[in-house]
């Protein structure tokens, strides 16, 4: 299972009743933070999640409302007695931004590692999560991300017994290893069922719709997507500034056949996002305004 918790739904600047958009994802006790705008550590403290469990911080892009909260988060980790390395991942320029922000938190009890992405990427994170990155269309380099938790194939003990495979080898086959027994090579396919769907969380913000996005987030259990404006008359502004309308987020969710959509990253001018939900749900019924500070658990589905 995978836990998710949205830390805010704001874009551009925090407001008295709206924190900036950021997302926590937890699997097997390991936490990933997607974006880290001003005030992220304050919003985090409403959740009950442990700072010490944070292994990776992932930036979509390097605008201030997505990175300026980094010094506070690093301080929070230090006071939580974090000693293990923390990885910071983002587009080209991330190392320079991290170095600048770290100048006011120069001494930390843990190493900080940076990794810059320059194109479509895939890498493993702690907790068995697979991070995928897709370049999207904003005013500066920006990425959409998915975090995927694979699910192992089901082991068939009756089949293993029928083949005379000793129980001492079962766990290796279940892990996907090929083993040798009685002069034969035994492959996992002999005793494992068909592939099973895992759990996928998609995070898309600060972009115009692109042809690649529906396939990239296809079938996600949860799509967290920006809806900068609700008024379709503001489409020219969205195009100019590299953002999506709430309606465009819903159209993406529908095209990608995701399970549910959380809308986030609202313009400060969008004072009542809830007012637009009827129109949004007419496009994609499983849409909601992102629930801030609520931990939601995503579980494996057999289908």
Swiss-Prot record:
Keywords: Endonuclease, Hydrolase, Metal-binding, Nuclease, tRNA processing, Zinc
SUPFAM superfamilies: Metallo-hydrolase/oxidoreductase
Amino acids binding Zn(2+) 2: 65-66, 206, 265
Cofactor binding, per record: Binds 2 Zn(2+) ions.
GO molecular function terms listed in the Swiss-Prot or TrEMBL record: 3'-tRNA processing endoribonuclease activity; zinc ion binding
Catalytic residues (positions): 65
Positions bound to Zn(2+) 1: 61, 63, 138, 206
EC number(s) reported in the record: 3.1.26.11
Chemical reaction(s) catalysed: Endonucleolytic cleavage of RNA, removing extra 3' nucleotides from tRNA precursor, generating 3' termini of tRNAs. A 3'-hydroxy group is left at the tRNA terminus and a 5'-phosphoryl group is left at the trailer molecule
UniProt entry tagged with the keyword Glycoprotein: no
Cofactors required: Zn(2+)
Keyword Metal-binding annotated: yes
Record Gene3D superfamilies: Ribonuclease Z/Hydroxyacylglutathione hydrolase-like (3.60.15.10)
InterPro entries membership: Metallo-B-lactamas, RibonucZ/Hydroxyglut_hydro, RNase_Z/BN
Domain of life: Bacteria
HAMAP family for this protein: RNase_Z_BN (MF_01818)
Assembly, per entry: Homodimer.
Functional note: Zinc phosphodiesterase, which displays some tRNA 3'-processing endonuclease activity. Probably involved in tRNA maturation, by removing a 3'-trailer from precursor tRNA.
NCBIfam families (UniProt xref): PRK00055.1-3
Similarity field: Belongs to the RNase Z family.
Name of the protein in question: Ribonuclease Z
